Amino acid sequence: MAYQHGITVLEQATSLTAPIEGDSAIQVVFGTAPINLAEDPYSATNVPIIAYSYAEAVKQLGFSYDFKKYTLCQSIYASFQLYAVAPVIFVNVLDPKKHKKQNAASTVPVENMQATVQVDGILADTVSVKKDTESGTALKVNTDYVTEFDSNGHLVITLTATGAGKDAKSLSVTSTSIDPTAVTAADVVGGYNASTGAETGMELVRQIYPKFG
């Protein structure tokens, strides 16, 4: 029989607490979310979204610890991270086509072929990137650079090795951001548009049971 001498370490995978799934009194939460970080920012407004896990909610709505600006994130954190309660139905009323603001051009230094834009709420599809200065060479997304968001929700621009910006020392970046401060109480309350048949805000509560049963 073999004996071990000295200090040994045993590592075990962190166990995950299974969420408590309810079939009655399910939360329906109305508010704002950082949908610029969502998988599809333009399909996450005034539509009931059901989530059974933190990952699922973040994928569909994005996430930020700035709970004052993004009120749905407080419920995402409390329900899935603190108390493991699922499912939760979310309705985001922040509309990226309506609640937005234009950001001034900013010069961002490049380090190791990457530049991080320290601006909140950027909609990735609105970004315009030029090499070095505002009058410099315009770069093409997915050809000269690719984008992603870091853990702080800031846009990271990565230059490609064969792109036109590969030797850039800085980038001039313009963009549009979502603006949660533009959301009003009227947006949350919502209503019914008789001409289009569209429902918004809390009026959508009528769709919850027919949609999710």
Predicted regions and their residues:
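Surface-exposed assembly/interface segments
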Residues: M1-G213
